[in-house]
Each structure stands twice: as C-alpha cells, then as structure tokens.
A protein has these predicted regions:
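Start-of-helix register in tetratricopeptide repeats
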Residues: 14, 48, 82, 116, ...
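PAPS-dependent sulfotransferase catalytic core
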Residues: 370-372, 376-492, 636-637, 641
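Register position in tetratricopeptide repeats
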Residues: 25, 59, 93, 127, ...
Length: 671
C-alpha cells in the first residue's frame, strides 16, 4: 500500500478507550466488556470501543453478539482493518473457514501490517488446499517478522489512520535505533499524510542514501516531489524506477503521466495514461485523469466521453459526475440525474463519493432552475466537506493582523532596492471564482506573456520560512521577514524565478495565478519588487456564493461554510487595503463586473499597467488556444456575457447568513 492509501484518522470518541487495552492484555474480558459499553453510552460510534466490545464478547464465548457489534462498527468505520481481522477470528471460532478467509483477506487488503491475519490466512489456506495462497501469506508473514515489532505496530496504526499514535512510537524507536530504513520510511509516510512534505523529502532522501535499491521508497520520493510541484525531479526518479524494474513499468507510468500534467505536457500524459488502462474498476481513476487533461486542452467532447467512461468503470464514482458538472457547460440527461439521486441516497455510498454527488446534483438542479433543491444539495455537500476540513478562520485573521503589523511602509522603505531586479512575473491574486482565470486568459493572449498556471512556488518559500511549527506555537511567518538579510531576500527572489522556469518558454513575462498569494504580497514585494500584481475582485455576494458552489480538488478550505467564506472575504478586503496604503500604485485592482461591461477598456488598462502595447487578440481571448487548468476553463473559451453576474439572486432566500456575515463589505468592496 502506498503512503497515499492510508485512511483518514478516525474521529476520537468522547472518552478515552486506551485503558481498556491494558485490560485486554490481562485477558480481563468481562471488565473490557463493561468498560466498552460505558464508553459506547457516551459515544455510540466510538471505533475502538466497538472493537474492544467485539473482542471481549468473542473471548467470553458470545460470538453472535460479537459479530453484531462488528456489523455496527462496519457501518461507521468501513475501512478499519481490525474489524475485519476480528470478524475473521469470530468466523474461525465458529469453524467457518470460507468467511474467515474472506474477512482476513479484507483486513490485509486494508492494512498489510497485520501479522495475526497473515498467520491465520496461511493456516486456513493450507487447511483448504490452497497451497499457492498459503505460500504468499507465509511470505508476507516472514517479511513482517524481519521488521522490528515496534515498526510493524506503528505501521499498522498508520495504515488505520491513527497518525497521532503511530508518530510518537516511531520517533521513539528511531531515537534508540538510529537510521533504520523501515522506520525512517514510515515517518516519511506519516509526514506525507500530514502534508509536511519537507520532512518527508529529507527522510526519503536519507533512506535512499542508505538503501538506493529500495524501490518503494523511491516511488514515495517521487510522490513527494510531485506534491511539492517539482515534477521534473520526480520524472528523473520515475525514469530510474522504470529502467531498473521494467516488468513493473506500468506501475510507475501513471505517476509519470501525472508529472507530465504538472509540467503542462497534457498530450503526452493522455497517451501515457491510456497505456496503463487494465479493463478493471481501477480504470475509473485513469479515465478521470485522461478527462482532466482533455478538459485542460479544450477537448470538451473527448473529456465528456472520458468522464462517462470513468463513471461506467466504477459505479458510484462521485468524482466522475462532479467533473462533468464542473465543466460548467455540461447538462445532465434525465437518466443521469435520476442515477445521481439514487446513488446519493444509497446508504452504502462512501462519504467522498456522496459529497461529490451532492455538488454535482446541486449544479444539475440549478441548471434546471430547481433552486430550492439545488441549494439543499449544495448545503449538504458543503457540510460533508466542512466536517473533515479542520479550517479555523481565526488563524487566517491572526496572520493578517501580523502581516499588517510587520509589513509597514517603513519596513519596505528600509529595504528599498532589495530582491531580484527581474520584472518577469505578473501575479494575479484575489479569491477563487473572482474572474482571475479570465484575466489570465486575456493576458496570456499577448505575444509577450506566458500563461503558466497556479504556481505553488510562493507557498513553498513561505513553508521554508515557517519551518516546522506545532499547532500550539505562534507562527514564525511573517515576523521572520524582518530577520532576513539583503542577500537572503535576493536568494528568495532567485529561488522563485528558478522554480517558475520549468513552466516557461522564452517569452519575457509570465503569469502566476495563485489567488491566495494576496496573503503574501509583503514577501513578494520584498523578493520581487519589479513584479506586477493584479487584484481580481468580484462583487462579494456573487463571489462568495460561487465559491460555496465549487468543490475544489484541494485547498480553499474556507469555502465550505457561508460564514467562513464571508469572513475570508472581509479579511481579504482588509489586507488588500493595507497593501494599497503601504505600497501605493503597486497593485492594480480589476473589477470583474467592469471587465464584463467594457472588455476592451479593461484590456487596455491591464496592458498599460504591464507596460505592454495593445494587441487585439487580447480582446478576442476566447480564440486563444492554450491549456487552462482551473474550474473556469470552459467559460474562458467563450465570448463574455453577463449570465454569471447575478446567478446568486436565484438563491437569495437562503443567503441571509452570508449577507449578515459580509456586513458592510457588500458596500465597501470598491473602495
């Protein structure tokens, strides 16, 4: 199982089940049963309490009751490997070999680090004459026995999503056992799951220094590099794997294709993806990746067909339906709409598929002008997404206050002349769904401007400046900006330009359209003072509700609650007003509604700001052939119209909370 297959941590129950583990080790099963039932009265869905209850019941000879408890556990935690392991033990106690084998096989399919399951499988396979499968199970068991028990235990916890328990165990082990590659690799995988990619990179580099032939670690190293948007380096690692392990080339080729997508080589990626199709349900993800690349290239009909193939390859694949809806121009058939309703209502559908289906149904019903029902699905989808986001608006608001306190006019005056003198970057900032893709398409139609993508380079620099922080610690950024020397600031500017180089051709200017960079304009001005910055702004209710309707592939956690979106918009206005005060004239604000009303006038204004001559193809931007990777990709390939400006008014009866949270922002957004 790859590092990305680990499931999300289970929600902690209201009371601590850990004391019951000690009772289990002492085989005090009656006390375990009483304790687990007490916990379940407080938290009926408690994962570990349900498991301990089942274990106690089995050991007390009450196997049917144990199986009932496991059925309850499966309803709430269907990807918890130990429930299937315990179910296997229950069936074995009843001498039901076939269902026992099925249960143990399910357990190890979710979690390879279960020695007891492998041991039971080996014995059951031998007993039923399946010698080949018995040998495979014996081999897996032997592999686990070669690894330190502490590492196996921590790996098992990790694969069940228990990161908070796994991480201290493996760190303690490394403190006493030094550079042990399996332990280091596991800690890297935990870092990947926590999205601490810098730590994961360092650990995997160390593993490969010690064990250069460790292919699983090299594959995970490539995954980390892709997550860090260093796709060219990832391809080097994948090419090494494909050369050394040609019989498993297709195993690596899908990730290689993903790296190609990151580098803008979409046609090549489509061909590579097609080579890894297998005719199984696994093809659903491959068809989806093909469709995304086709959509980026503007191949709308081909993308629709590929999205439909993804839906057909895996029934209930919510992402395929949402991706069709996310084309913005696609209209579902009555049969597709009915199918989506049925899938969303199915109790067996997974949470991720359900939330994708909710957003897709919201868009489909909005297109049919069934606004009340559409809002109900949008609301449900957002509630599902918000429940797992962990977003805290207070953190963004606190960071904004720090930006304002640190990045004063005096701060910049004292550092005048610092940073790189390169004028190449044109930053487009603001909120998502604010017209930034339209501005990018207009500017990228100019002969001297390269349209790249939403580059993560600024965020990577910010992450390095922050270092590793605990949630309980005050952030080093942005205060750390005041500690940087002139040389360090210059190096940051050159690092940014180097990171962007892989996405450019020979045009003198390029666009970085990462909306959230508005939060880092102090850093950007420090390291790239000659860069141009364009603030793409949209009327607040339209902008916020458009974000509420959008399910983002990653990030943008503030968009899954109307109140959170409104608070974020107000914070954005506050910070942009600050940049206008301390860096007057450095940022050009472009109001989306003004572009729709007078496209040529706004195009001329944009090009004047960039110091470039007017070119008529910028007005006819929809004719420009280029890759567009955002949710607005189909919309910017059409002439401008006013259709989207007032769509929020169809949902006005349900937007009271949004208006209340926005407050005076609905009036002052043009100030």
């Amino acid at each position: 199982m790859s590092s990305t297959d680990a499931i999300s941590p289970a929600a902690a129950p209201a009371a601590d089940p850990r004391p019951l583990r000690a009772l289990l080790r002492q085989r005090k099963f009656a006390e375990v049963l009483a304790g687990s039932r007490a916990l379940l009265e407080q938290s009926p869905e408690g994962r570990d309490a349900l498991l301990f209850q089942a274990i106690a019941l089995r050991n007390l000879g009450r196997v049917p009751e144990a199986l009932d408890a496991l059925s309850t556990l499966e309803r709430h935690h269907p990807r918890f490997s130990r429930l299937y392991e315990e179910r296997g033990h229950c069936f074995a106690a009843q001498r039901r070999a076939v269902p026992a084998m099925d249960a143990f096989a399910k357990a190890v399919s979710l979690n390879l680090a279960l020695p007891a399951s492998w041991s039971m499988l080996e014995g059951l396979y031998r007993m039923t004459g399946q010698t080949g499968k018995a040998a495979e199970a014996a081999n897996e068991l032997a592999t686990l026995r070669r690894i330190a028990p502490e590492v196996v235990g921590a790996t098992s916890l990790f694969l069940d999503g228990d990161l908070d328990e796994a991480e201290p165990l493996i760190r303690d082990y490394l403190l006493t056992h030094g550079n042990e590659v399996e332990a280091m690799r596991l800690l890297a995988r935990i870092g990947m799951a926590r999205k601490v990619f810098d730590d994961a990179e360092i650990l995997l580099e160390a593993v490969l220094q010690i064990a250069p032939d460790y292919r699983a670690a090299r594959l995970e190293y490539a995954e980390v590099l892709i997550e860090m948007h260093r796709e060219a380096e990832a391809r080097v690692q994948l090419e090494k794997l494909m050369a050394e392990d040609p019989q498993n080339r297709l195993h690596y080729q899908g990730l290689y294709a993903t790296a190609c997508v990151g580098l803008g080589e979409h046609e090549r990626a489509i061909g590579l993806y097609r080579e890894v199709l297998t005719g199984t349900t696994a093809d659903a993800d491959v068809h989806l990746s093909i469709a995304h690349a086709q959509k980026t290239l503007g191949q709308r009909a081909e993308a629709i067909e590929s999205y439909r193939r993804a839906a057909a390859a895996r029934p209930g694949f919510g992402d395929a339906y949402w991706s069709l809806a996310n084309l913005k121009t696609y209209r579902f058939t009555p049969q597709e709409l009915e199918q989506m309703r049925a899938l969303e209502a199915d109790p067996a559908i997974g949470r991720i598929d359900r939330l994708h289906l909710c957003f897709a149904l919201g868009k489909a019903l909005e297109d049919q002008r069934s606004f009340a029902e559409a809002f109900r699905y949008y609301q449900l989808g957002n509630e599902l997404r918000h429940a797992s986001s962990g977003y805290a608006p207070e953190i963004i608001e606190s960071n904004t206050r720090q930006q304002i306190a640190v990045c004063t006019a005096e701060f910049f005056a004292a550092r005048q002349g610092w940073g790189s003198i390169a004028p190449d970057p044109i930053f487009i900032v603001g909120l998502p769904r604010s017209g930034s893709t339209l501005l990018e398409q207009i500017l990228a139609s100019h002969s001297q401007i390269e349209g790249t993508q939403e580059l993560a380079t600024v965020q990577q620099i910010v992450a390095r400046l922050r270092g590793r922080e605990l949630k309980s610690e005050a952030s080093r950024y942005p205060a750390v900006l005041a500690e940087l020397s002139r040389e360090e600031v210059g190096e940051l500017g050159e690092r940014y330009l180097k990171g962007a180089r892989v996405y450019r051709t020979d045009k003198p200017f390029f666009i970085d359209k990462m909306p959230n960079n508005f939060r880092h304009l102090g850093l950007i001005h420090l390291m790239l003072p000659r860069a141009k910055v364009i603030d793409a702004r949209r009327e607040p209710i339209a902008c916020c509700f458009s974000n509420f309707k959008q399910l983002f592939a990653k990030g943008q956690e503030f968009t899954y609650s109307l109140e959170d979106i409104a608070r974020y918009y107000r914070t954005y206005l506050e910070l942009m007003a600050h940049w206008d005060r301390v860096l007057p004239g450095w940022v050009l604000r472009v109001q989306h509604e003004d572009v729709v009303a007078d496209v040529e006038g706004q195009v001329r204004r944009l090009l004047d700001f960039c110091g470039l001559p007017f070119e008529p193809q910028c007005v006819e931007f929809h004719k420009t052939v280029r890759s567009v990777r955002t949710a607005s990709s189909e919309q910017v390939r059409q002439p401008l119209n006013r259709e989207g400006l007032d769509q929020w008014q169809n949902f006005e009866p349900w937007l009271g909370a949004l208006k209340d949270a926005l407050g005076d922002a609905v009036r002052r957004y043009r100030e």
